[in-house]
């Protein structure tokens, strides 16, 4: 049975990936900061699907903890076939109003962790001739909206570039770019009422999102943008004049996942 390592696996999109991959008979390595919560998730998945579930508590903004996760990906005796880089970090304030230390921590999680873990996972996959790298990015990466958007733009470009580099190896790389998703992400940013952020039609279901992404992975697609509404929106954003794109980026009462 294949093994998938998922970061940010205790809730939201990461949990949806864990459930979907367990249902597809993947053993799991679940990574998040909250070990107690991970243990509960692991117990439920073992009982429901009969798969092995390993828990690895780690704060990916901490370089020592990140290296422990990278070591797990490199372990030749316990190969990982699927890497899902999903760990998130919300930024509450605009760049000029915020704390640079918080911005740096966000980049450690959203950029450096993706870089380090992908570099640890991909070479063993290539050596075995199969595997998949999935990076959870965001449609925010197509906007001009501060450090979070810039980090997601990097994640998308990095992963799509990696897909080209991996062509012919049997290993795929896919950047998942969701819009607004019904998870705990916005509640953690202090936004309890989702209607303040976006209308009801804009919100996506995490389980459906993951199912669509895994279908794109199986097709070898480098970019997965769920739902027609977001595919149309991102196409428009990429082709509008810069002045208009900047105006859209300034209007940010909340962010897509």
Question: Which residues are covered by each model-predicted region?
Answer:
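Substrate-binding pocket helix/loop in short-chain dehydrogenase/reductase
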Residues: 94-96, 102-107
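Conserved glycine-rich cofactor-binding loop
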Residues: 10-11
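C-terminal helical subdomain
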Residues: 175, 196-233
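Conserved glycine-rich Rossmann-like NAD(P)H-binding loop of the short-chain dehydrogenase/reductase
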Residues: 24-40
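Active-site helix of classical SDR
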Residues: 118, 151-154
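A short, exposed helix-loop element centered on a Lys and neighboring polar residues
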Residues: 118-119, 160
């Amino acid at each position: 049975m294949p093994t998938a390592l998922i970061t940010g696996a205790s809730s939201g999109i990461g949990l949806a990936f864990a459930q979907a991959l367990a249902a597809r008979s993947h053993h799991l390595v679940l990574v998040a900061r909250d070990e107690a919560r991970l243990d509960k998730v692991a117990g439920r998945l073992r009982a429901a699907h009969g798969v092995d579930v390993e828990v690895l508590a780690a704060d990916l903004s901490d370089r020592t903890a990140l290296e422990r996760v990278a070591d797990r990906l490199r372990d030749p005796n316990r190969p990982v076939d699927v890497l899902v880089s999903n760990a998130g970090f919300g930024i509450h304030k605009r760049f000029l109003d915020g704390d640079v230390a918080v911005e740096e921590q966000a980049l450690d999680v959203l950029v450096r962790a993706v870089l380090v873990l992908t570099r640890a996972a991909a070479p063993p996959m290539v050596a075995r001739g199969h595997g998949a790298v999935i990076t959870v990015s965001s449609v925010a990466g197509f906007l001009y909206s501060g450090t979070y958007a810039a980090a997601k733009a990097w994640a998308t470009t990095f992963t799509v570039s990696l897909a080209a580099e991996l062509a012919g190896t049997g290993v795929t790389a896919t950047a998942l770019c969701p819009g607004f998703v019904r998870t705990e992400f916005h509640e953690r940013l202090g936004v309890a009422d989702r209607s303040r952020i976006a209308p009801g039609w804009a919100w996506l279901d995490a389980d459906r999102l993951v199912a669509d992404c895994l279908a794109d992975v199986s097709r070898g697609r480098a970019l997965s943008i769920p739902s027609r509404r977001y595919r149309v929106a991102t196409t428009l954003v990429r082709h509008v004049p810069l002045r208009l794109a900047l105006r859209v980026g300034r209007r940010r009462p909340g962010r897509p996942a």
